[in-house]
């Protein structure tokens, strides 16, 4: 069994036009998001997570529309195959400034990732302190 943590990054420019790659449950969630930035970030997170899952375990997952990335009870992302229920992986999704990051680990475990832009102003303050 693969016990390594995998990660993959994507950008807004990588997301295909339209929503055909989203599952029915995901499209329902997307339709309830009112603000365009929230919709854009949400789509980026789902695209990045699906690409990560398919890149690291391509034989284990269905095509993108049959793979849903939904919020678990604790609010974290969880993968579901539309024909088989929850997928036995752990996910973490982060997005910032038009870039998305997804960490994937096999099985159920605590996994996390965070993507933030380092601002030059912040570095100058840290150095002068």
Place the predicted regions along the sequence by residue:
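Core catalytic alpha/beta fold that binds nucleotide/phospho-ligands
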Residues: 1-129
């Amino acid at each position: 069994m693969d016990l390594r943590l995998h990660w993959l990054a994507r950008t807004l420019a990588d997301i295909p036009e339209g929503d055909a790659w989203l599952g029915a449950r995901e499209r329902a969630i997307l339709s309830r998001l009112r603000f365009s930035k929230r919709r854009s970030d949400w789509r980026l997170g789902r695209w990045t997570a699906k690409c990560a899952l398919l890149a690291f375990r391509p034989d284990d997952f269905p095509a993108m529309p049959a793979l849903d990335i939904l919020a678990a009870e604790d609010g974290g992302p969880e993968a579901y195959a539309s024909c088989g229920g929850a997928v036995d992986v752990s996910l973490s999704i982060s997005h910032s400034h038009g870039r998305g990051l997804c960490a994937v680990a096999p099985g159920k475990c605590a996994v996390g990732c965070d993507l933030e832009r380092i601002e030059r102003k912040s570095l100058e303050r840290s150095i002068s302190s």
